[in-house]
From Swiss-Prot:
Organism superkingdom: Eukaryota
Pfam families: JAB (PF01398), MitMem_reg (PF13012)
Name of this protein: COP9 signalosome complex subunit 6
Record-level GO cellular component terms: COP9 signalosome; cytoplasm
Stated family: Belongs to the peptidase M67A family. CSN6 subfamily.
Gene of this entry: csnF
Keywords annotated in UniProt: Cytoplasm, Nucleus, Signalosome
Location of the region described as Disordered in the Swiss-Prot/TrEMBL record: 218-241
Annotated S-S bridges: none
């Protein structure tokens, strides 16, 4: 959307009492759409739809989706009506429990607020889909300073109202006698909070853990000579062998975490052993360092820790080992039976093929013997006629 258009932000604050609950999945969709649009150097407005629930004075923004934008006859941005209706219906079929509906749309806008360039699409959604649709604006110019603003997101959510052309700062319209008051769409900012479900927390945690392995690469559009490409490959081949894939880096990080945990556990066990040795009168360390006094609180904690070990280790180790061995034997037996079945099938195939070969050979021998017999008969008949 062009930033040089006229701002249509209302001078009056919202008095509707609406409150927006914004979910992270919608934010991820918006961020992904804007990032791909910028990475591909695409032109044109960035527009998307918002799905959620409208319960009284609370509106939830739970999901978002991208929208196709077409240019109207007067150069304004519009949504293809048939495509948009089908798209919303598809998302409603997917999100049936809980039932989600179209509650608004989103786009990019300057920090000063929506402009007249946003009105065509907003009017289209108000007239055809939702009379109380909200408008979420993302401010790309505030992305760099978002980390320095104590976590404030670079976005604003608005509701649309109809106001007269001449509205004072306190919200009262100035109407001239005998003149009809014209009503235009104005936007008022709404408060919002971030709400996160359990499934969203898992998804965001996965994205956060795998984001460190993401990297951007630039593709060159200029074709280099084949000789130069071969030489570059030969020079770069040893360097590429040292690079690790994202999966390998994640595996190394996981192994390092487990190694650090094991080292910490070992140090704690060594500390407990040294403490018990220092207070035990029967040990050499206890006789040398008799100044160490037993602490009953620490001893009770150690005793509780040792008692919990029995829950991890079975009481009857022999029975557990026998059961484990029996399970291993069952698995091995099933594997051997499978191999035996494959061997039997292979032997059957060999027997069938051998029978076919023997049958062909037998037929050939019979044909050869029959032909020799016929030749002998023909030879005898010729001698008799002569």
């Amino acid at each position: 959307m062009p930033d040089e258009a006229i701002s249509i932000l209302s001078q009056k604050s919202s008095d509707s009492g609406l409150h927006i609950q914004l979910h992270p999945l919608a934010l991820l969709t918006i961020s992904d759409h804007i990032t791909r649009h910028a990475a591909r150097s695409q032109q044109g407005p960035i527009v998307g739809g918002l799905l959620g629930q409208h319960n009284g004075r609370e509106i939830t923004v739970e999901h978002g989706f991208e929208c196709v934008v077409e240019i109207g006859p007067n150069g304004e941005a519009q949504l293809p009506n048939e495509w948009f209706v089908d798209r919303v219906k598809q998302f409603k079929d997917v999100h049936k429990v809980p039932a989600l509906d179209l509650i608004g749309w989103w786009s990019t806008a300057p920090p000063s607020g929506p402009t007249t360039a946003h009105l065509p699409i907003h009017r289209q959604i108000l007239q055809n889909h939702n009379e109380s649709a909200v408008f979420l604006t993302f401010h790309p110019s505030q992305v760099q300073g978002a980390s320095q603003s104590q976590g404030k997101l670079p976005l604003t959510i608005y509701e649309s109202v109809y106001e007269g052309e001449s509205v004072t700062e306190n919200g009262k319209a100035m109407q001239v006698d005998g003149e009809e008051q014209l009503l235009n769409i104005r936007f008022r900012e709404l408060p919002y909070t971030i709400e996160t479900g359990e499934a969203e927390m898992i998804g965001i945690d996965t994205v956060a853990r795998t984001a460190r392995n993401a990297a951007a690469t630039e593709t060159s559009t200029v074709a280099a000579p084949s000789s130069q490409i071969d030489s570059d490959k030969q020079e770069q081949q040893p360097a590429n062998t040292d690079l690790l894939s994202p999966e390998e880096e994640e595996l190394i990080a996981s192994l390092n975490t487990r190694l650090n945990a094991i080292r910490t556990l070992e140090s704690r066990i060594s500390l407990i052993k040294s403490y018990l040795s220092s207070i035990s009168p029967s040990s050499e360390e206890g006789q040398k360092d008799s100044a160490t006094k037993p602490d009953h609180t620490i001893l009770r904690d150690i005793n509780s820790l040792l008692s919990n070990l029995s829950l991890l280790t079975p009481h009857e180790q022999s029975a557990f080992s026998a059961e484990t061995l029996a399970q291993n034997n069952d698995v091995s037996l099933v594997a051997l039976l499978g191999q035996l079945s494959q061997s039997v099938n292979g032997m059957r195939e060999v027997g069938k093929r051998t029978a076919i070969v023997n049958s062909v050979r037998r037929n050939r021998k019979q044909l050869g013997a029959q032909s020799r017999y016929e030749d002998d008969i023909l030879g005898r008949d010729g001698v008799a006629l002569g």
